[in-house]
């Protein structure tokens, strides 16, 4: 399970060190793809494969479904962390997420998200008020 917030730095070669506590779950490989809200999503390879099979089963008669599947698959980059736990983020991924040197990696239960640190701070400020309201609507009394 992926939980918590971490602040690794992106190096000049586009490499990002993943939090040590998650490396065991990612030794079988991982997939980096575009995420929501201009973040990057990092899935264990098996989790991404399961989600891809689910997406492939959706009818492609809908333009929205076709666009989603195309964007998801076209932006997917399969990787294995190196011995230091680093992954290399493509120029396209770094550009999409607006990544600078300062990054934030957050656990999203079954996958990770990579954010530019300033973008994450802004997102948190903008969504903080909705957090309490969302509990009842989205999670039915989780907290």
UniProtKB/Swiss-Prot annotation:
Gene3D superfamilies: Transcriptional regulator MraZ domain (3.40.1550.20). It is found in: Cytoplasm, Nucleoid. GO terms for cellular component: cytoplasm; nucleoid. Its main location: cytoplasm. Keywords: Cytoplasm, DNA-binding, Repeat, Transcription, Transcription regulation. One of its GO terms (molecular function) is DNA-binding transcription factor activity. Residues 5-47, 76-119 form the SpoVT-AbrB domain. One of its GO terms (biological process) is negative regulation of DNA-templated transcription initiation. It comes from the Bacteria. Pfam families: MraZ. InterPro entries: MraZ, MraZ_C, MraZ_dom, MraZ_N, MraZ_sf, SpoVT-AbrB_dom, SpoVT-AbrB_sf. HAMAP family: MraZ (MF_01008). Forms oligomers. Belongs to the MraZ family. This is Transcriptional regulator MraZ. It comes from Corynebacterium efficiens (strain DSM 44549 / YS-314 / AJ 12310 / JCM 11189 / NBRC 100395). The gene is mraZ.
């Amino acid at each position: 399970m992926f939980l918590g917030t971490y602040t690794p730095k992106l190096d000049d070669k586009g490499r990002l060190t993943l939090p040590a506590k998650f490396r065991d779950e990612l030794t079988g490989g991982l997939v980096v793809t575009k995420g929501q809200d201009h973040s990057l999503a990092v899935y264990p390879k098996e989790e991404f494969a399961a989600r891809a099979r689910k997406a492939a089963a959706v009818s492609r008669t809908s333009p929205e479904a076709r666009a989603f599947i195309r964007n998801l698959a076209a932006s997917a980059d399969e990787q294995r962390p190196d011995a230091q736990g680093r992954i290399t983020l493509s120029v396209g991924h770094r550009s999409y997420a607006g990544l600078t040197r300062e990054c934030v990696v957050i656990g999203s239960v079954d996958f990770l998200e990579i954010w530019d640190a300033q973008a994450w701070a802004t997102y948190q400020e903008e969504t903080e008020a909705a957090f309490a309201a969302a509990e009842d609507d989205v999670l039915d009394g989780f907290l």
